[in-house]
Amino acid sequence: MAMELVHVGFGSVIAVNRVVAFLSVDQQPIKRLIRESKENGLFIDVTHGRKAKTAILFDTGHIMVAAVTAETIAHRLDTASMLSEGKIGP
């Protein structure tokens, strides 16, 4: 089984098969999860100093924050899926 990687900004990629959810960082419960993940050493910041827009929850318990929106990541995921299925050309 091939691992599908999706670009989440600034040279960072994620393994799609490990993602549980894409979440908005504006909600209080998500802010709490981010704070707890920082305390437990499970936090990954790939914003490069920009405003965090999306929190990505992984099956390992890690939380990554990215400066791109969840919609942008979803569009990249759809495009990658269509490329791998041969529906569109490279």
Predicted segments, located by residue:
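Compact, glycine-rich, soluble single-domain proteins
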Residues: 31-40, 45
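Short aromatic-glycine motifs in intrinsically disordered, low-complexity regions
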Residues: 1-13
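Short, charged/polar surface micro-motifs in flexible loops or helix N-caps
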Residues: 13, 25-30, 39, 61-63, ...
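C-terminal structural segments of small proteins and small subunits
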Residues: 56-90
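Short, structured protein-protein interaction patches enriched in aromatics and acidic/basic residues
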Residues: 45-59
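A generic structural signal for short beta-strands and their flanking turns/coil linkers
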Residues: 4, 15, 52-54
